[in-house]
Structure formats: structure tokens, C-alpha cells
């Protein structure tokens, strides 16, 4: 049994779509990054890689590599799940939280949960997705960024 944790943060900017857990969320700003900047999916990927002792997402998908420019993070997550499986692990569950002041994410959580579960070949009951605010503190609280945390439990195959 292995436990992994992941974290990611990206700036919010105008002119980019907001993608969380592979779902496009209607909002006037999106996250800035080399790929689609999906903070939630990135945090989950890092948690999976960490639990399997496989380094981090920057090692496998470096931002200076043009192959990953604008990449769909759900496709990257599927590659990470495959890597973890090749190391002899299977995912027992994932728990995650997105930290953002706006937009309100509650209406989108079921779709995000379903998309992430599908990408990891899990039941939605194995994928926890929550949202909270940062109580207007720091860059996330001021609406300048979004962050996400994730924890995963891996079991031997």
C-alpha cells in the first residue's frame, strides 16, 4: 500500500479557457500554463507519481517540451495511470480539493468526478472532488490563481 500527495497552482488570466478535471468551466478567466493548466488533474498526477516513487509530472511532461504545449491533461493523466500500473500498482481511491474564490464549482463537481474516474478507469465513488475558498487570503484568495491538492491510495496489483 502506498499513499501519495500532490499540489499544483496556476495563475488565472483572461483569454484562456478554465479546465478543471478535464471539464471546461464557464468563466471569464482561465489558468495559465504550458499545457491546458488543469490544476486539479496535475495535482492528481503528481500524487499518483509520488505514491509510486516515479518523480513528478515535470519529469515526464517538461514545460520546455513543445509536445506538451496546450496538451489535454486528461490524456497525460491516462499516461500516468499506465505508468503506475506498469510499476505494479492500482488505484484504490483519490481525494482532492480545488481552492478558488470564483467561479463556484459545486454545480460542476459531478461532471469533474465522472471525467476523472473515467480517465483513471475507476468508479466515481473512488474519486473525491471538493472545492473550497482561501477566505480571500493570498493570491488564490485575491482571485489571481487557483490551487489544488490531491491524495491517492495505491494498492499492489
Swiss-Prot record:
Co-factor requirement: a divalent metal cation
Pathway(s) it belongs to: Isoprenoid biosynthesis; isopentenyl diphosphate biosynthesis via DXP pathway; isopentenyl diphosphate from 1-deoxy-D-xylulose 5-phosphate: step 4/6
Cofactor notes: Binds 1 divalent metal cation per subunit.
EC number(s) per entry: 4.6.1.12
Stored InterPro entries: MECDP_synthase, MECDP_synthase_CS, MECDP_synthase_sf
Listed GO MF terms: 2-C-methyl-D-erythritol 2,4-cyclodiphosphate synthase activity; metal ion binding
Source organism, top-level taxon: Bacteria
Keyword Nucleus: no
Keyword field: Isoprene biosynthesis, Lyase, Metal-binding
CDD domains, per database record: MECDP_synthase
Keyword Lyase (UniProt): yes
Residues holding a divalent metal cation: 8, 10, 42
Residues where 4-CDP-2-C-methyl-D-erythritol 2-phosphate binds: 8-10, 34-35, 56-58, 132-135
Site, as annotated: Transition state stabilizer: 34, 133
Catalytic activity: 4-CDP-2-C-methyl-D-erythritol 2-phosphate = 2-C-methyl-D-erythritol 2,4-cyclic diphosphate + CMP
Enzyme class: lyase
A biological-process GO annotation: isopentenyl diphosphate biosynthetic process, methylerythritol 4-phosphate pathway
Alphabetized HAMAP family for the sequence: IspF
Family assignment from sequence similarity: Belongs to the IspF family.
General function of this protein: Involved in the biosynthesis of isopentenyl diphosphate (IPP) and dimethylallyl diphosphate (DMAPP), two major building blocks of isoprenoid compounds. Catalyzes the conversion of 4-diphosphocytidyl-2-C-methyl-D-erythritol 2-phosphate (CDP-ME2P) to 2-C-methyl-D-erythritol 2,4-cyclodiphosphate (ME-CPP) with a corresponding release of cytidine 5-monophosphate (CMP).
Subunit structure, interactors included: Homotrimer.
Protein's recorded name: 2-C-methyl-D-erythritol 2,4-cyclodiphosphate synthase
Organism: Synechococcus sp. (strain JA-2-3B'a(2-13)) (Cyanobacteria bacterium Yellowstone B-Prime)
Chain's gene name: ispF
Amino acid at each position: 500500500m502506498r499513499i501519495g500527495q500532490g499540489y499544483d497552482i496556476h495563475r488565472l488570466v483572461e483569454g484562456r479557457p478554465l479546465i478543471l478535471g478535464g471539464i471546461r468551466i464557464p468563466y471569464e478567466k482561465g489558468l495559465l500554463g504550458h499545457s491546458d493548466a488543469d490544476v486539479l488533474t496535475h495535482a492528481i498526477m503528481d500524487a499518483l507519481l509520488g505514491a509510486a516513487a516515479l518523480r513528478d509530472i515535470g519529469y515526464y511532461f517538461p514545460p520546455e517540451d513543445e509536445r506538451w504545449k496546450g496538451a489535454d491533461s486528461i490524456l497525460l493523466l491516462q499516461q500516468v495511470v499506465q505508468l503506475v500500473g506498469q510499476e505494479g500498482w492500482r488505484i484504490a481511491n483519490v481525494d482532492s480539493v480545488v481552492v478558488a474564490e470564483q467561479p463556484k464549482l459545486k454545480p460542476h463537481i459531478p461532471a469533474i468526478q465522472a471525467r476523472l474516474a473515467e480517465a483513471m478507469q475507476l468508479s466515481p465513488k473512488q474519486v473525491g472532488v471538493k472545492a473550497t475558498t482561501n477566505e480571500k487570503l493570498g493570491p488564490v484568495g485575491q482571485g489571481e490563481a487557483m490551487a489544488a491538492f490531491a491524495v491517492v491510495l495505491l494498492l499492489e496489483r
